[in-house]
């Protein structure tokens, strides 16, 4: 199972910015929930796409960059800073975690200035 996430942080917590990012990007974000020690209002926005290992490859880097690049100036006007935008992949694997990325995709990501994080976690067989 793979969890592809686009995260956008912003300095002024509030639903106004959260809703503006949602409208601007045109995708449904993960619902915001207040955490025990977190702020009373959202200070980040995230979009999640889940795919299983049998699903066709989801090119999350290009898909997320296609969402962000044409809207970057508008995001910056909302108070988002480039450094607070990141893409992440969490991969739950059974036998091996092997990931590869296209060189052009990596160049594009590097030029964007957005962060990338990858977490791999082995799924434990609970059928024993």
PLM feature segments, named:
Residues 1-128:
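Acidic (Asp/Glu-rich) sequence patches and key acidic residues
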């Amino acid at each position: 199972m793979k969890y592809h996430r686009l995260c956008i942080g912003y300095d002024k917590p509030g639903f106004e910015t959260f809703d503006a990012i949602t409208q601007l990007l045109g995708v449904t974000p993960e619902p915001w929930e207040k955490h025990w020690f977190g702020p009373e209002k959202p200070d980040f926005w995230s979009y999640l796409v889940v795919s299983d290992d049998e699903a066709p490859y989801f090119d999350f880097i290009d898909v997320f960059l296609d969402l962000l690049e044409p809207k970057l100036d508008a995001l910056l006007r909302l108070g988002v800073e480039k450094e607070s935008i990141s893409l992440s992949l969490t991969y739950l694997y059974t036998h091996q975690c092997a990931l590869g990325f296209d060189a052009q995709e990596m160049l594009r990501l590097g030029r964007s200035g957005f962060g990338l994080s990858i977490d791999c976690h082995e799924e434990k067989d609970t059928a024993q």
